[in-house]
Amino acid sequence: MVTIRLSRGGSKKRPFYQIVVADSRSPRDGRFIERVGFFNPLASGNVERVRINLDRVNHWIGHGASLSDRVASLVKEAQKAA
């Protein structure tokens, strides 16, 4: 099953997440099919917090991909801002 979820990057105590399309059996930070955006939880000021390619997310949802809970809330936030 294909899932759209967060993959952690960044350094210790400074998380940065890639929003990726991956097989649900793959490890969290392991192999993925496509990168569709990023999420920076520590963003402040003029720094961009979330960027999501909504066209690609909708494409994968149409092909049966499921969203993780956190990614679903980020997509909803991005759709509201767009």
From Swiss-Prot:
The reply to whether Ribosomal protein figures as a keyword in the UniProt entry is: yes
Put simply, this protein is called Small ribosomal subunit protein bS16
Q: Which InterPro entries match?
A: Ribosomal_bS16 (IPR000307), Ribosomal_bS16_dom_sf (IPR023803)
**Might you report a single GO cellular component term?**
cytoplasm
The Gene Ontology biological process terms listed for this entry are: translation
As for family, the record states: Belongs to the bacterial ribosomal protein bS16 family.
- Gene that specifies this protein: rpsP
Asked if the keyword Amino-acid biosynthesis belongs to this entry, the reply reads no
Q: Which GO molecular function, any one, fits this protein according to its record?
A: structural constituent of ribosome
Keywords for this entry?
A: Ribonucleoprotein, Ribosomal protein
